Each structure stands twice: as structure tokens, then as C-alpha cells.
């Protein structure tokens, strides 16, 4: 039996576009052929994500996105990629303000990019570098973004 459960939460920030963001995530999951999922996405500030980054990765600094995979049995695994997602994404909206400026993109575009990035990690995709021209995961990320990009 497949599940489709998506929860969006906001911690310590104001975010007024949950409906658009929710629809975007469902569209991304559909594009990636994921119909069986239990996914929670928490949008937060740097303090919140830094605590988690320190606790689980021993890095006492904020980051853009953390992904936590709870599908330990790897149900839905096909060719090393998991098409059944059970996990959490934690995204620092505050951090994205800086990275959006650094990459000269709009903050909501960066939010969409890191959301896709986190979902791809939950599926089992990985990358060695941040080379958007050569890394398969990052190429896929940008293709999925082009197909699903929303205006907030």
C-alpha cells in the first residue's frame, strides 16, 4: 500500500507561501516518479538548523538543507535509487537569503533548488563536487527545477 503524506512546518521564521510550496513539492515528487512518500519539510532559521547540524553532523554552523532518511530498509530501491521516501528535510530560509545573493538568484528559486537537492539525497543520489556541468545529481536537480519552477 502506498502512502502520500507531506507535512510542512515553519520554525522561528515567517513564511506566507506554504500552499505554493506544498504544490511545488508534490509536483517535484511526481516528476521524480515518487508516489509513495512520508515527507516532512521544516523551514527554519539559522539557529534551529545549526543545532541540528551540530547534533547530527558535528558541524557547529548553519547550512542550507539537512536531509534525514528514515527508510532504513530501502524499500522501493531500484538500481541504487529509492522511489519510496520516508524522511525529513530541514531548510534554513535565513541561510538561503545569503546563498541566493551569492548565486545571484531569487530566494524562492534557491528554496526550490535546495528542496529538490534534499529530495534527491533522500532518494539516494549523491555528488562528489558542486560542478553543475558534470555531476549527474546536480544536472538532474536543475532539470527538475526547470520543469517545476513556481512563482511565489
Swiss-Prot record:
SUPFAM superfamilies: Metalloproteases ('zincins'), catalytic domain
Keyword RNA-binding: no
Record's GO cellular component terms: cytoplasm
Binding site for Zn(2+): 117, 121, 127
Cofactor note text: Binds 1 zinc ion.
Molecular function terms from GO: metalloendopeptidase activity; RNA endonuclease activity; zinc ion binding
EC number(s) stated in the UniProt entry for this protein: 3.1.-.-
Protein's UniProt keywords contain S-adenosyl-L-methionine: no
Cofactors that this protein relies on: Zn(2+)
GO BP terms, alphabetized: rRNA processing
Function description: Single strand-specific metallo-endoribonuclease involved in late-stage 70S ribosome quality control and in maturation of the 3' terminus of the 16S rRNA.
PANTHER family: ENDORIBONUCLEASE YBEY, CHLOROPLASTIC
Family recorded in the similarity comment: Belongs to the endoribonuclease YbeY family.
Protein known as: Endoribonuclease YbeY
Protein's organism: Borrelia garinii subsp. bavariensis (strain ATCC BAA-2496 / DSM 23469 / PBi) (Borreliella bavariensis)
Gene: ybeY
Amino acid at each position: 500500500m502506498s502512502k502520500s503524506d507531506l507535512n510542512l512546518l515553519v520554525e522561528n521564521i515567517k513564511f506566507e507561501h506554504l500552499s505554493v510550496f506544498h504544490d511545488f513539492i508534490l509536483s517535484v515528487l511526481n516528476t521524480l516518479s515518487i508516489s509513495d512518500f512520508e515527507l516532512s519539510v521544516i523551514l527554519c532559521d539559522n539557529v534551529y538548523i545549526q543545532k541540528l547540524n551540530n547534533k547530527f553532523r558535528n558541524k557547529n554552523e548553519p547550512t542550507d538543507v539537512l536531509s534525514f532518511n528514515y527508510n532504513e530498509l530501502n524499500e522501493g530501491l531500484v538500481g541504487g535509487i529509492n522511489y519510496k521516501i520516508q524522511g525529513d528535510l530541514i531548510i534554513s530560509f535565513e541561510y538561503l537569503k545569503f546563498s541566493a545573493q551569492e548565486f545571484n538568484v531569487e530566494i524562492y528559486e534557491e528554496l526550490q533548488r535546495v528542496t529538490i537537492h534534499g529530495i534527491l539525497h533522500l532518494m539516494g543520489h549523491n555528488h562528489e563536487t558542486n560542478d553543475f556541468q558534470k555531476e549527474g545529481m546536480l544536472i538532474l536537480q536543475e532539470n527538475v527545477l526547470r520543469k517545476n519552477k513556481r512563482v511565489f
